[in-house]
Amino acid sequence: MKIVLAYSGGLDTSIILKWLKETYGAEVIAFTADIGQGEEVEEAREKALRTGASKAIALDLKEEFVRDFVFPMMRAGAVYEGYYLLGTSIARPLIAKHLVRIAEEEGAEAIAHGATGKGNDQVRFELTAYALKPDIKVIAPWREWSFQGRKEMIAYAEAHGIPVPVTQEKPYSMDANLLHISYEGGVLEDPWAEPPKGMFRMTQDPEEAPDAPEYVEVEFFEGDPVAVNGERLSPAALLQRLNELGGRHGVGRVDIVENRFVGMKSRGVYETPGGTILYHARRAVESLTLDREVLHQRDMLSPKYAELVYYGFWYAPEREALQAYFDHVAKNVTGVARLKLYKGNVYVVGRKAPKSLYRQDLVSFDEAGGYDQKDAEGFIKIQALRLRVRALVEREGHGA
């Protein structure tokens, strides 16, 4: 039997690699995706080989991640439960897509992942796998093995000579990519406990951020960001640049309790500096370029799209149908937003667009601009008609 494992190089997937070989008598191919997590991918590849993988594949997927997953999601204005910009959720279908592809190329019968049986990631990985290859076998060791906790896993690692660099458990777990870093578990499981001050890796503490604000301009073309401060950049390079700018000023920290797809509530702390800047910049350009009813309709559909991404339905027909709508709307989003970054905050201070629907002569108090204010009287009376009828009926105590 041959299995392709999504391998990070950490404790869990290193143990899983050895466990798969022992339990299934299988040949294991390790796959590591570089999506901007900041870890040494080549080091993880070498570690996989030392741990017993017959082959280790490492791919740089940063551009594909941002171009084909993050940017389409951002065109939809997706935010889960009002705060979460979906940094972990959007990475899973990309990784699973390549897991399935490699399994097909290598003639493997199964894929495996290190997601636990309590979280969302198991669903995201497996829904993607079954959507792309319905007959694929998926192995989820966390749902099969008998380890009762980290101590038993560390003991297993030591007994099998697995090169785990640290045996001391961190007070929280962390997952990183080019869009964000997430923290959960351990000391963060108490929703009343403030996150440890030294936990954050991507952003400066807002209290210690520069005392002077920094301005940044983000240019959009047909829905996608294409330049920062006038410099055109590739999708991954653009997001990285904004991560650096936002991180310097403590932008993008979020601490929430969210509803997992599997039914439980979970506390998550996130850093999304570049994504937060892009969210505000996009809204600024959209305010000029989108018709009122289109914008309101888009905002009604965005939460459903975010839910689909969070749940793992990236390759589902309903997500694809919504994407077609959002992509059509985004074709009008061309322009520039100017923002001020200051001690954890993002302020929109300017916006412009070549096809702006904003007409200064119409809204100016100093110019008529072709708008007759007397027209408002009839408009208001028509809008008030149903309200007046309701009030009259209630006053009379009976209907017509």
UniProtKB/Swiss-Prot annotation:
ATP binds at A6, Y7, S8, G9, G10, L11, D12, T13, S14, A33, G114. CDD domains: ASS (cd01999). L-citrulline binds at Y84, S89, N120, R124, S173, S182, E258, Y270. One of its GO terms (cellular component) is cytoplasm. Coiled coil: none annotated. GO terms for biological process: argininosuccinate metabolic process; L-arginine biosynthetic process; urea cycle. Pathway: Amino-acid biosynthesis; L-arginine biosynthesis; L-arginine from L-ornithine and carbamoyl phosphate: step 2/3. Homotetramer. This is Argininosuccinate synthase. It comes from Thermus thermophilus (strain ATCC BAA-163 / DSM 7039 / HB27). The gene is argG.
